């Protein structure tokens, strides 16, 4: 008996054929359903509006991504190298890839999530501290045990008495040390019990960078670094360093978060200033100086989101808020937002702080000031770690930093879309902090698929003390998320520009600018127009530089 062909067998059994009208109707319905689902994605409209050159560039980037992933998988003997752990990546090798070159060259708009203490290279900061005259150190207790060295408070402060004879004064490593007394930096370093100055530098560096398996980076690093940034010469040097690095990464505007819990001192002054208005003055001076340089051309500016630790007492929080209002009054162009940050496990929740936050808003209104809320919320996956999302939305936050648990709340997802709230997301940093296992377990792809507006930021330096720039965040997103391409990155850059606080705006004007986007007439519209012009030039470069990839067949 002759074997039947597949088609003959199917006809004999009465199996419908693909060309049958009702099967074709099913396929049309299927295609419509897929298209309808894709309309929910964050980059749907941008994908449809891409000019031909940009569409070609997107196709080339996707091919290069797939080729390099295939090569990496083969070399590592893996089925899929899409999800390497950030801490184990050979970044030197990554930076030699075509995909890295492309992402590095991409214009990146604004950086909206940027803790100032995490933006500074650890080795640079330590060198500046050692070369600044009069620097002293102090601790709240003697630092004797390894636990003391790892966790206890340690800070810097200028003192004109640092050069005087203090040979008999116990250092912080001695049980005889008097808590909070100042010890000259070089004396403390040379007497460090684990290797003198070299060991001290290594220890100090370890306090300034994330450590594998430990999620307490900000608790350890933020107070230490901010104590250094509270002295004028070091603040100026670090701002120059950070502005230059950001501009070289394709960033044209930044909003730093920083805390103001240490008294600020001018150069050579033992007595601190009242408040932090002079800090803001230095910030504006250094920004203007950088913008006047050749490398600062095209840098739109920088502003500050005043970050208040939730661990402070409510009375101290109110005093911190008063300091913020005064600084905003004196230097309105510097302060653009207010955040309540998580710095310890035992702290006030946003719910606990609602009365104080209403008081803050009333005081701002009375002074004619506009300081928008940009809250950390939903950044912990532990039970109860998502409750701040409800408060952030109800309090009218324009942006939410974190949002790791947002995807678990369908109603909040819809509210955030309706109220046009941006989520500031830092997948690589979240992995560094131990909040997620990697890009494959990060909620970013889910948020994007549901049409939530997201921008990428950076929340921690790398393990070697170098700041994690946006290029790394972009590279991880495009190589680690299957549905992410150049269009997805471009949409997140557009979001970063649309949600930038270039200038103070009342709510109605803010929402109007968000709705109008590139078609508006204000600052944001012009910045979007400039970015799209830069993006088209970038896409043209991609099509010319990697033209051979366009005609290659996928393996």
Q: Model-predicted segments: where are they?
A:
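Metal-cofactor-binding active-site regions of metalloenzymes
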Residues: 2-422, 426-555
């Amino acid at each position: 008996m002759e074997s039947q062909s597949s088609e003959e067998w199917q006809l004999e059994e009465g199996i419908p054929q693909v060309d049958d009208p009702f099967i074709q109707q099913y396929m049309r319905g299927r295609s419509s359903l897929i298209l309808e689902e894709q309309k929910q994605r964050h980059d749907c409209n941008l994908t449809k509006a891409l000019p031909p050159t940009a569409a070609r560039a997107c196709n080339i980037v996707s091919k290069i991504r797939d080729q390099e992933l295939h090569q990496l998988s083969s070399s590592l003997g893996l089925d899929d190298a899409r999800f390497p752990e950030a801490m184990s990546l050979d970044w030197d090798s990554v930076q030699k890839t075509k995909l890295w070159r492309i992402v590095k060259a991409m214009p990146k708009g604004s950086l909206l999530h940027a803790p100032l203490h995490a933006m500074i290279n650890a080795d640079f900061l330590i060198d500046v501290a050692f070369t600044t005259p009069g620097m002293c150190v102090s601790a709240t207790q003697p630092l004797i045990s390894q636990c003391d060295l790892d966790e206890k408070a340690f800070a810097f402060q200028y003192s004109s008495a640092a050069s005087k004879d203090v040979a008999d004064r116990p250092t912080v490593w001695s049980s005889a040390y008097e808590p909070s007394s100042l010890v000259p930096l070089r004396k403390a370093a040379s007497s460090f019990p684990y290797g003198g100055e070299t060991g001290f530098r290594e220890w100090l560096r370890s306090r300034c960078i994330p450590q594998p398996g430990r999620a307490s980076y900000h608790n350890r690093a933020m107070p230490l670094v901010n104590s250094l940034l509270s002295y004028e010469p070091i603040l100026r040097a670090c701002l120059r360093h950070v502005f230059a690095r950001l501009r070289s990464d394709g960033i044209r505007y930044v909003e730093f978060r920083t805390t103001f819990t240490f008294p600020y001192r001018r150069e050579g002054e033992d007595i601190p200033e009242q408040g932090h208005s002079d800090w803001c003055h230095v910030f504006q001076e250094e920004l203007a100086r950088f913008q006047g340089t050749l490398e600062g051309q095209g840098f739109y500016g920088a502003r500050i989101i005043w970050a208040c630790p939730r661990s402070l007492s409510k009375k101290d929080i109110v005093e911190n808020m008063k300091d913020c209002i005064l600084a905003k009054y004196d230097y309105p162009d510097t302060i653009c937002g207010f955040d309540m940050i998580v710095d310890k496990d035992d702290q006030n929740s946003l719910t606990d702080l609602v009365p104080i936050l209403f008081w803050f808003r009333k005081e701002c209104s009375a002074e004619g000031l506009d300081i928008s809320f940009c809250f950390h919320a939903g950044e912990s996956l532990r039970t109860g770690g998502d409750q701040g999302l409800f408060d952030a939305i109800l309090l009218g936050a324009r942006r939410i930093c974190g949002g790791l648990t947002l995807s678990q709340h369908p109603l909040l997802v819809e509210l955030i879309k309706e109220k046009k709230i941006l989520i500031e997301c830092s997948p690589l940093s979240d992995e560094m902090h131990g909040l997620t296992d990697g890009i494959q377990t990060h909620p970013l792809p889910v948020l994007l698929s549901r049409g939530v507006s997201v921008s990428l930021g950076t929340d921690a330096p790398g393990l070697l003390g170098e700041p994690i720039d946006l290029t790394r965040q972009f590279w991880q997103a495009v190589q680690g998320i299957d549905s992410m391409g150049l269009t997805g990155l471009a949409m997140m850059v557009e979001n970063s520009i649309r949600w930038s606080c270039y200038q103070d705006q009342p709510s109605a004007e803010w929402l109007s600018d968000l709705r109008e986007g590139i078609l508006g007439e204000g600052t944001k519209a012009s910045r979007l127009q400039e970015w799209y012009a830069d993006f088209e030039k970038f896409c043209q470069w991609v099509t010319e530089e990697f033209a051979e990839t366009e005609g290659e067949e996928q393996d």
